[in-house]
């Protein structure tokens, strides 16, 4: 009984101490924020379902675009002010170049290897290797790959138009992105009619979905300091998800290593092997970099494609403007052979500004990674003209959703208006950086942009994208590691 009473007393003292730490002001210039509770901090106030929306409400309450938020035991700031963001991510990059560490990121990044979760010299070395590897990849081969993948996608969904059936494109966009990455990284073709549940991609698809579930935001044990070590060993003991997918990637690595020709790399994995080497540590880095590329380029691109389709279905006027632009470009091409299909390629992009504006406007209104990847403050520092104080150890997040709906940066932010990205008189482009900014900008942004452009342009050229019974599709998102649309279906009508 005495032991129990002692433990309860210790726990009470811990709760009081936790409450005190979370609510004392450490500097007169620190950001404002709501009352922090013991253990959980502000995780209840911002919620799990729509934290980006709740944070926008708090910005109005405190009348500032920087908020102090306790994520469990971790002091964090959420930013939606462009000047402050640029000051941190560009001007003071060295102090904010690292990623914060947690049990989940340690498990998911092979002890902070790779590109997404690494910091310091490890990140700098990996970044240079990946940039060089992507530069060495044959551009012509990549363009051909993308054209073929887009043709396969359109061929596969054309059955719904011919059968006059409604369908949800989620599965097909996800398969398109995974198939593209599979070919780009492993040089393996996936037949367009192959099923994701039992084909070549099945194991990878299943494990990727499990990883996104595992990493879903809001796991309390990942945010309580005294639980960090036991939680990590628990994860290590029970983990099957990361082990399975890393095992799959290592098998691909071994097969490549047996047949590699350093002078003639077949794919990105060959180039990574050439750049890194073949030591045990090199294998761990190659495995993690490969996993990072799949994670960064799968759900983000697939979900963005869905949001663009939804916006086009809900905005038929903008869809027709885009179609007329595409039709003009295609009709101006010299067709040598009637058998050659009239289609959009990446070379047409400079002549299709409205399509690009639609993509950007959708990404503004529906950023799929609303908070980006956090940064870590290495030392106490002041930021911005207001001299906000950011303490050492603070986690730093960008609220992309709040930026996109800020009238200071985007006039009539709740209106879908692609023209805002065609006008030189506004600051839309200066406020638009969906792939991040500074030295840690997303390395795969060009491939992602190419995929988005080719899929959307060729779909609009071939089909009218329509809602069912002319009812608008619900645009409320489901918050997770990425923000995805609710269930919906569309119709295709041949042009």
Swiss-Prot record:
Q: How does it sit in the membrane?
A: Single-pass membrane protein
Which metal ions or organic cofactors does this protein require, according to UniProt? heme
Q: Does the keyword Transmembrane helix apply?
A: yes
Q: Which GO terms describe its molecular function?
A: heme binding; iron ion binding; monooxygenase activity; oxidoreductase activity, acting on paired donors, with incorporation or reduction of molecular oxygen
Read off the CDD domains from this record: CYP1_2-like (cd20617)
Instruction: Cite the InterPro entries for this sequence.
Output: Cyt_P450, Cyt_P450_CS, Cyt_P450_E_grp-I, Cyt_P450_sf
Task: Give the EC number(s) listed in the UniProt record.
Answer: 1.14.-.-
Pfam families for this protein: p450
Segments passing through the bilayer: 3-21
Top enzyme class, one word, equals oxidoreductase
Q: Where in the cell is it found?
A: Membrane
Keyword Oxidoreductase in the entry? The reply is yes
Q: So what family is this one in?
A: Belongs to the cytochrome P450 family.
Q: What is this protein called?
A: Probable cytochrome P450 508C1
